[in-house]
Amino acid sequence: MEIAVSFLKSKYDLDDTLKEIDNTSANYIHVDLMDGEFVKEKTNSLEIIASLKKCRKPLEVHLMMNDSSLLEILPSIYDLKPKYIIIHAEIKDPKFFISDIKEHGISVGIAINPDTLVSSISDYIKNVDEVLVMSVYPGLGGQKFIEKTTTKLASLKELPKEKNFIIAVDGGINNETISKVSGLADRVISGSYVCLSDDFENRIESLR
């Protein structure tokens, strides 16, 4: 199982946090960018993007943004050449953005919020490389894992093998909740559990 580390909450400043993650065994740096419209919270996305240019690890960029914000930010994201860009199923036109991201040679993921059904992405699922199940409500770090989201992971796992995407889960992942998603998720995203600790690598290893 792959580990991606989110840095929404950290005991260090942005640059030092990214350096710490870069020096761990994490598979990806998970980048949460928010527009203050799709979710209430807003990140200083351009500052974050500038800092990410120094990172060595592959990037997975999770865009909690509406359609107009996506159109504005995506050119800057493309310049980063991330491995994955994840958009939300709840926006107006996921199909357009899935196509646009793939045209730039970047793997695309689609995220579903805790109250969004797996069936709602049936029209897109054959065209994505990752399905990200949110196990907390998007926007804030440090929330508790929502147990009911494991049923979505199980439903995705049962889909025909020709559906060629990885299953990821994001939110409330720690050494106690990891067992609930083990065997169901191919990738887990952990944030506060890692970045508020004194030893990032130790926390990452506890999830494997």
Enumerate the predicted regions with their spans.
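Conserved, mostly hydrophobic/aromatic
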Residues: 21, 32, 77, 131, ...
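Catalytic cores of alpha/beta
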Residues: 16-21, 69-79, 116-127, 171-188
